[in-house]
């Protein structure tokens, strides 16, 4: 069996170290830096010939820098004769650009990134909760898209929620909400239906479901600016919700996210470490971060040993 080696870029070094600790191995020795003009510089400082190499790197902000680090690291490994290269991308950036809207003259950037990674020589991709599962089909190599839900569910169950109801923040998240509700004992769900009655009129947050006097659990795959999430929480509290918790795998937290969440009626926001939490977000006092290290370490072990990934969720 080829020697397994883990390497990390600069995007999520803490998560990479936690994964290495779980696997009882050290992170590989690589220097990922910048030339004076800003170009990415990579030097692999140990022998990887014939090794089963895993490169851990989310393509979160700064998205283009982190993507280029990953691409250049893959090329360096390929030229150093690595036996197999797996890109471990907990958060896959550009995933929201997965389609053309009608006849709009826009790119499908998720496909561009998939081609970029495939063409540079990656053999396999491991990611978590892709924004759109069909992105797996953009790649010409195998993609394992695993679920972060078990990590979030563990926290939900430990909170002793009172008469809980799972809430989808929009119509597109109903399938996720139903799956979460089933895992929590087939509890009720509610849906926040955001719509604009007519042009130049503020959006109205319509609520479908009973939340009065109950703990609400909003579930989503990611939180960006948090604007819609905070409005959904307000709508729930206005309808008598007791407490409102928000759960998401990916803590994108861009723009005014820190301000929005700090000033919101949300009781707690629970996310994972697929993206490193900024000091500004941590200072809000409302964000709890859970680690994906155990799940990712097990997935990496299974890939290296040619074992089933889907069996992790049976």
UniProtKB/Swiss-Prot annotation:
The gene is prs. This is Ribose-phosphate pyrophosphokinase. One of its GO terms (biological process) is ribonucleoside monophosphate biosynthetic process. It comes from Vibrio cholerae serotype O1 (strain ATCC 39315 / El Tor Inaba N16961). Its EC number is 2.7.6.1. Mg(2+) 2 binds at residue 170. It catalyses: D-ribose 5-phosphate + ATP = 5-phospho-alpha-D-ribose 1-diphosphate + AMP + H(+). Homohexamer. D-ribose 5-phosphate binds at residues 196, 220, 224-228.
